[in-house]
Design a protein with these regions (language model features):
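Acyl-thioester-dependent acyl-group transfer interface
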Residues: 6-196
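Short amphipathic alpha-helical segments
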Residues: 1-2
C-alpha cells in the first residue's frame, strides 16, 4: 500500500497514513465457550510523511506492535470500555433501534473505516486424516468494509498459503502491486481471479 501510494501521490506531504486492521483471536487470551466471533484488532500504522520505510523496517514495526498489544492486559483494556457501556442504566433502558443507530455512528467514527484494509490470517488449517484426501485447497474470503474497498483473507493448507484479496471496486491495482512485491521477493506465485 505504501509503495502504491508513493507511485500515485508524488508529493509526500499529501500522502495519508497507512493503517491495517489485524484481527486477534481473543480465545487464546481469554478462555471462552462462546461460538460467536470473539476477536479484537491490532492496528499497525505507518505515516509515509515521516519518511521512507523499508520492507524490513515495516515487518519489524508490525512484529513489535503485535508483541506489545497481543496480551491479556492490553486486550482487556480495549474491550473494558464496551462492557462498561453495556452496564450504563441509560443504555439499558434505551430502545434497541436507537442503540443500533448510535453504535453505527460510533463504528463509522472509530471502527474499520479508519483503516486501509483488514488482513485476517487463519494460519495453518489442520483437518482429520480421513478428510485430507478430499480437500485440494482452502480459501478464506472476508467481505469488504463499507468505506474501505479492500480486504484480505489468508489461510494455509498443506505447504501453500492462499491469499484471497477482495475488493468492491473494479481496479485491481493493489492486487497487481502486491503480486509484483511477492515476485520481487522471489516467492512463487500463482494468480487466479473471478473477474470476467
Amino acid at each position: 500500500i505504501l509503495e502504491l501510494q508513493t507511485e500515485k501521490v508524488p508529493n509526500p506531504r499529501h500522502r495519508k497514513p497507512v493503517k491495517v486492521l489485524l484481527p486477534v483471536n481473543l480465545r487464546k487470551l481469554f478462555p471462552s465457550k462462546t461460538l460467536r466471533n470473539f476477536a479484537s484488532y491490532i492496528t499497525p500504522e505507518i505515516d509515509p510523511r515521516l519518511g521512507a520505510c523499508s520492507f524490513q523496517e515495516l515487518c519489524a514495526l508490525v512484529h513489535h506492535k503485535m508483541g506489545l498489544e497481543n496480551n491479556r492486559w492490553t486486550m482487556r483494556a480495549k474491550f473494558a470500555a464496551n462492557v462498561a457501556s453495556e452496564r450504563s442504566p441509560v443504555l439499558r433502558v434505551m430502545p434497541l433501534f436507537i442503540k443500533n443507530i448510535a453504535m453505527k455512528a460510533v463504528f463509522d467514527t472509530v471502527g474499520e473505516c479508519k483503516s486501509c484494509l483488514c488482513l485476517s490470517n487463519l494460519g495453518r488449517v489442520e483437518l482429520p486424516d480421513v478428510m485430507v484426501p478430499y480437500v485440494r485447497r482452502m480459501d478464506f474470503i472476508i467481505g469488504v468494509q463499507a468505506k474501505a474497498p479492500h480486504n484480505c483473507g489468508v489461510v494455509t493448507w498443506g505447504d501453500t498459503a492462499y491469499i484471497n484479496c477482495i475488493r468492491s471496486i473494479r481496479e485491481p491495482e493493489l492486487e497487481y502491486h502486491f503480486y509484483r512485491v511477492l515476485h520481487r521477493l522471489g516467492l512463487p506465485v500463482k494468480v487466479e481471479s473471478n473477474m470476467r
